[in-house]
Amino acid sequence: MVGIQRLIKHDDGTVQEISITADGWVKESYYKKKTPVKPDSNPGVKYEELEPVHRVFSKKPTCQQLFFYLLFWWTYLTIVVLLTVPLNPYQIHRSYRLMMGPASYPINCNRATPDRYSRSCFSSFFCTWDIFMPEIKVQNETFYPNFTKSDGSPADYSSALLWATSFITNPNCTNFTVLYSDSSNSSQRNDSDYEVATFVMLEGLFMLRHKCHPETVYLGRRRCGAHRWRFVNVYDTSYLNHSTCSFDWASLSNASYTPQLGPNCSMANLTEEELKSGFYLHLQQVEIKPSQ
């Protein structure tokens, strides 16, 4: 409340006034009689104002102070939560293969140098060390991730991967097999091998869909916070074709295709850490068998 809050009369006749200004400051003023008089002998005697000894002692909290106070604690708690939950690797529960498998995420989530990226409109995968895309085996044809087919001629691996991913993620489509580099295989949904296979294939499609902007994607063995906070959905399935299980593989095999391939990968450029990562298990082949 603005205005005089308290009046105090001391034994020497000095009057102390405590008030609050419009700015929220606490002000103390002292007044003394001009001539000494007996107490209460002449109530009409005027008082003179003395220079305040301490004009301001404190200030009441304002909305601005409260805002910065709350902002400080909100920032502090946010940092604590980030360090203890989403950025804590011990909080990530995944199977062995899921942890070791390739993962893609936006470039702003890593600190790789610019020369690690292909900066052109290539239709192939990036020349990166830790991504292993599967062969797509269908009927009498096999599509390879280097954009060739069984006879070595160019082929549209991008469409083949899209169809194969649509097939194995469609609950109405059956009769498929995923094969890993250790010769283990699975033809069942909802197990770890199937889950990892779908993740790897969706990551490959994510890269191919951004082929004209390869600098926006980087491949690594860990998923970054942006994807885990769902700012980027690497595993989006909305664009897949789940309307059919009968894809025209023969037409895709016979179609002419000229891929715009990126630079060849050179093993000499790999670091020791990158070479070691190549020993991890990876998805080797996805076989789509004809319906019976």
UniProtKB/Swiss-Prot annotation:
Topology versus the membrane: Single-pass membrane protein
Keyword annotations from UniProtKB, A to Z: Host membrane, Membrane, Transmembrane, Transmembrane helix
Chain ranges passing through the membrane: 66-86
Chief subcellular location: host cell
Subcellular location: Host membrane
Gene Ontology annotations for the cellular component aspect, listed alphabetically: host cell membrane; membrane
Domain of life of the source: Viruses
Name of the protein this chain belongs to: Uncharacterized gene 27 protein
Taxonomic placement: Viruses, Duplodnaviria, Heunggongvirae, Peploviricota, Herviviricetes
